A protein has these predicted regions:
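Active/binding-pocket-proximal capping segment
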Residues: 247-261, 399-427, 462-465, 474-476
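N-terminal, post-signal-peptide metal-ligating segments of extracellular/periplasmic oxidoreductases
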Residues: 2-117, 191, 195-231, 261-263, ...
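Non-cytosolic beta-sheet module surface loops
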Residues: 56, 66-68, 234-237, 246, ...
Length: 476
C-alpha cells in the first residue's frame, strides 16, 4: 500500500537522500531489512526507513552488514507462497564477482534474524556512473522491490568523460512505481499526478501504479531558468516502464546503465532527445537545462505500450520544476587520482555476420514464465556457459505479447540491433527492452576476470522473474 494519501501535501521538495561516502578507500554501513510504519518491507539506515545513496570510487571496497529484522511470518503475498521473508542484496550493474561475499544472490540468503556480511571489491578500472542495489530473493523479489527495498550507487568519475558535470548541481532521483491497488482513494492519487488513461495500448485498463521520486509523490525539483544540472535517474520500479520527458527542454543523455556514451563512441559523448525510454532497472544520466519560468514545467513519463498482455503504463507527472537556487557540488575527485578514461569501441562486423553463440527465448503462458522453455529452479544446472576473456553474440527473442526487459548480472553488453536492423547508435547496457514478438542482438562482454562463478540473467519485470523467467550462466 502506498505510504502517501490523496490528502497529502503537494509541492514537497524532492527529498535529499542520505549519502554514505568513502573513508580511506572503504565505504562501510549497516543496513536493516525491516517493516516500516505503513506495514511495508523497507530498508532502514541510521534509524530511518530510507535507503542511502552509496558513493564509491573505482578501486574502493564496499562493506555492508545487512541485517534481516523482518518478522518470521509475513502478512503479504508472494509469487511462491507463503512468503518466507528471506532477503539478500544484488549490486545491479556492478562488474564484480558473483561469489560470496560479493554479488552472490544464489547462495547468500538471510532468513529473519540472520545477518549477511558483504565485502564488495570495485575494480580500479570500473566505469563511472549510476548503479543501484536491491533485494533479490527468488520468489519474493517483486514484493520487496514494490515495497521499495532499493537504493542508488554512484561510481565516481563521470567528469573524466563529460568534464562539464564536475561543477554542475547533481540530483540523484530514485523513481519507484508504487501500488495503489488497495488504496481507498486511488482515483484521487491518480488525479494528483495528472495520470492520463492509457491511450497507447490497453485503453480499457486502469493503471494500478503511481510513481514516487525519492519517496515523495509529485515532489518539487528546484532549478533556475537556463541553469544546467546533472540528473541521475534510476527506474527502481518492480514492473513499470518510464518514458521520460522534460517540459520545454530536451534531455542531454551522457550515460545509460552506468556506462558513459563515450565509452563506445568517444566522438559522440552526448545524445540529445525529446524523451527516453527507461525500462525497469534502467538508469539514465543527463544534463538538463531549467525551463522558462513563465510557464509550468514538469518531469513526466509518457504512456508506454507494453503489449496486449502487458500492464498499463499510464502517462503522469513525476515532479514539478520550480525556480530556486542550487549550489554546485564540490568535485568528489579533488584529492583522488583516477585513471584516464577508457574506451571500448568494438568492430561489430564479425558479430553481425555470425550466428548467435546463444539465443534466449522469452515465453509465457497461464502457468508461468520461461527462458528457452524452462522455469528457473534454484538447484538447476546452468543453462549456458561462457569462457572468461571472450565476447559472445547473443540474441534475445521475445515470443510473447508483452515487453520484457532482459538483465544479466556482472557484465554489460553492447546492444547493436533490433529486429535484425542495425541500431544507429549502439549502446552499452545491462538491461535492455525486448520488443513484443521481436529480437535484440547484443555483444556480451565476458572479458573481465573478476566475473568468474555462477551468475544469472532474467526478465526484470520481477513478477516474471519470481515466476520462472530466469536462468543461470556459469562464467568459467
Amino acid at each position: 500500500m502506498l505510504a502517501v494519501s490523496a490528502a497529502g501535501r503537494l509541492n514537497v521538495p524532492a527529498a535529499s537522500l542520505p549519502e554514505v561516502r568513502t573513508e580511506s578507500h572503504v565505504v562501510s554501513l549497516t543496513l536493516h531489512a525491516t517493516v516500516n510504519s505503513e506495514g511495508r518491507d523497507s530498508f532502514a539506515y541510521n534509524g530511518q526507513n530510507i535507503a542511502p545513496v552509496i558513493r564509491v570510487f573505482p578501486g574502493d571496497t564496499l562493506k555492508i552488514d545487512y541485517k534481516n529484522d523482518l518478522p518470521v511470518h509475513s502478512t503479504e503475498s508472494c509469487a511462491i507462497s507463503p512468503c518466507k521473508n528471506m532477503t539478500n542484496l544484488h549490486f545491479h550493474g556492478l562488474e564484480i564477482s558473483p561469489q560470496s561475499p560479493q554479488d552472490d544472490v544464489i547462495d547468500m540468503m538471510a532468513m529473519p534474524g540472520d545477518t549477511l556480511h558483504y565485502v564488495v571489491k570495485v575494480p580500479p578500472d570500473h566505469p563511472p556512473g549510476l548503479f543501484w542495489y536491491h533485494t533479490h530473493p527468488h520468489g519474493e523479489s517483486h514484493r520487496q522491490a514494490l515495497d521499495g527495498m532499493s537504493g542508488a550507487i554512484v561510481i565516481e568519475g563521470m567528469e573524466r568523460y563529460v568534464p562539464e558535470v564536475r561543477n554542475l548541481h547533481e540530483q540523484v532521483l530514485v523513481v519507484r512505481g508504487e501500488s495503489i491497488e488497495h488504496v481507498p482513494d486511488a482515483a484521487a492519487l491518480l488525479r494528483r499526478v495528472d495520470a492520463k488513461p492509457p491511450s497507447c495500448g490497453s485503453e480499457s485498463e486502469t493503471t494500478e501504479r503511481v510513481f514516487t521520486v525519492n519517496g515523495e509523490l509529485r515532489p518539487t525539483i528546484r532549478i533556475n531558468p537556463g541553469e544546467r544540472q546533472f540528473w541521475r535517474i534510476v527506474n527502481a520500479s518492480a514492473d513499470q516502464y518510464l518514458d521520460l520527458q522534460l517540459d520545454q527542454q530536451k534531455l542531454e543523455i551522457v550515460a545509460l546503465d552506468g556506462m558513459p556514451l563515450a565509452y563506445h563512441d568517444p566522438k559522440h559523448p552526448r545524445r540529445i532527445v525529446d524523451h527516453a525510454l527507461v525500462p525497469p532497472a534502467g538508469r539514465l544520466e543527463a544534463i538538463v537545462t531549467g525551463p522558462d519560468a513563465s510557464a509550468h514545467a514538469a518531469l513526466r513519463t509518457l504512456c508506454v505500450d507494453t503489449g496486449s498482455a502487458g500492464d498499463p503504463n499510464a502517462a503522469m507527472v513525476l515532479a514539478d520544476l520550480r525556480k530556486g537556487a542550487s549550489t554546485p557540488r564540490a568535485p568528489e575527485t579533488t584529492n583522488r587520482k583516477l585513471a584516464p578514461p577508457e574506451y571500448k569501441s568494438l568492430d561489430l562486423g564479425s558479430f553481425e555476420s555470425s550466428q548467435p553463440d546463444f539465443v534466449a527465448t522469452f515465453t509465457e503462458d497461464k502457468n508461468g514464465f520461461y527462458i528457452n522453455g524452462q522455469k528457473y529452479e534454484p538447484d538447476a544446472a546452468p543453462m549456458t556457459h561462457a569462457r572468461v576473456g571472450t565476447y559472445q553474440h547473443w540474441r534475445i527473442l521475445n515470443s510473447s505479447a508483452e515487453l520484457h526487459p532482459m538483465h544479466i548480472h556482472q557484465v554489460h553488453f553492447l546492444a547493436y540491433a533490433e529486429d535484425g536492423k542495425r541500431l544507429e547508435n549502439p549502446v552499452w547496457l545491462d538491461t535492455v527492452n525486448v520488443p513484443v514478438g521481436g529480437t535484440v542482438d547484443v555483444v556480451m562482454d565476458f572479458t573481465n576476470p573478476v566475473i568468474k562463478g555462477m551468475s544469472l540473467f532474467h526478465c526484470h519485470l520481477l513478477n516474471h522473474e519470481d515466476k520462472g523467467m530466469m536462468a543461470k550462466i556459469l562464467f568459467e
